[in-house]
UniProtKB/Swiss-Prot annotation:
Comp. bias intervals (Basic residues): 1-18
Function: May act as a scaffold to regulate the recruitment and assembly of spindle midzone components. Required for the localization of AURKB and PLK1 to the spindle midzone.
PTM sites of type Phosphoserine: S154, S241
Tissue: Highly expressed in duodenum, esophagus, pancreas, prostate, salivary gland, thymus and urinary bladder.
Lipid group attachment sites (N-myristoyl glycine): G2
Protein name according to UniProt: Coiled-coil domain-containing protein 69
Basic and acidic residues composition bias: residue spans: 19-33
Organism taxonomic ancestry: Eukaryota, Metazoa, Chordata, Craniata, Vertebrata
Gene that this polypeptide is encoded by: CCDC69
Amino acid sequence: MGCRHSRLSSCKPPKKKRQEPEPEQPPRPEPHELGPLNGDTAITVQLCASEEAERHQKDITRILQQHEEEKKKWAQQVEKERELELRDRLDEQQRVLEGKNEEALQVLRASYEQEKEALTHSFREASSTQQETIDRLTSQLEAFQAKMKRVEESILSRNYKKHIQDYGSPSQFWEQELESLHFVIEMKNERIHELDRRLILMETVKEKNLILEEKITTLQQENEDLHVRSRNQVVLSRQLSEDLLLTREALEKEVQLRRQLQQEKEELLYRVLGANASPAFPLAPVTPTEVSFLAT
């Protein structure tokens, strides 16, 4: 404003020096030059006012351009800071998840080793028990065979002596004894085959038990893995929800700060331009589109 007054004062034509009237001469009538002089002064004032308005408009445009540039720089800086913060959070989450996965893996390894030791111990006990059963049955079979052999020998000896005393010829006796021995051998063979079938059945049952134990161990391991994955998914979803809430709160704070900064700039611009001067270009307020853009 001060420049305007100085400009107007500089644009005024210079005043003519007044000459003192001579007392001897009668007063002369003033020339009629007031009208043209006032017209030139009005034109000069209008030109100065238009130049001042043009300069004022340029100042407003420059201030608005500076405001837009500062707003863009501020938005870019906020976006970079937000990206860095999100990247740091993601790195921290990755480190935390890796630590948790490592701990869970160690726990699974420990439980797997314990289960492996328990199953190995139970398998050894079952194998030793079955081996003891097989050895006991084998010894019983051998003892039975030895006993039958002794009984047969004693019976054969007694019958042979008695037959010789009664008949004097051993041929018929040997035929009868051979038939009885053949019958006994057939019975023993059937008994042996029965014991063999039982042993084979026990081996088959043992193999099936081992296969079932392996399947149970595999299913338990898969069940534990599924439980661990579900717990990790729940923890990750909760963490992401918390991060989303924190990001929204930070975004709201940034939007409030931006509005406050914009309001301060508008007040400063209002003070610079004056209370009566209205800017030709209105300031762009914070729109919901910009907020959603920052949120994404």
